[in-house]
């Protein structure tokens, strides 16, 4: 019973820390800020993150920021520099390097790949619609489906 309470408390700390990061990822955050918010010391927070998520608080913050950046890169007109700043990176070059490490391509190339994939999907969808219309047209004319 006591062990379960300890686990529940640890999970609650991690949950609160994750929520804090999700709300504040666009600002400069130090692990100390997160630990202070959760009311635990920095090393204990690190241990909790390692046990619960398999990564450090810094790694979680970086992964969350880069995930948000990847979402924002889907919006074609947003400049990469603005996305970097919006995701808590003060230096666009640091952002680009971190993004490349996570995704294997630069933010600009990632955006191009997304657009190419969208175009491919749109072309495939258009082809399916045209085939469907053609089948429907043949049915209406009494031809073979």
List the predicted regions and their residue ranges.
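An amphipathic alpha-helical interaction segment
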Residues: 1-5, 9, 44-46
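Residue-level marker of regulatory loop/turn positions in helix-turn-helix DNA-binding domains and
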Residues: 6-10, 23, 38, 61
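Short, structured helix-loop boundary elements
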Residues: 7-14, 31
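Terminal helix-turn-helix DNA-binding modules in bacterial transcription factors
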Residues: 18-19, 23, 28, 32, ...
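Short coil turns linking two alpha-helices in DNA-binding domains
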Residues: 41-42, 90-91
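Short hydrophobic/aromatic patch on the recognition helix
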Residues: 44-45, 49, 94-95, 99
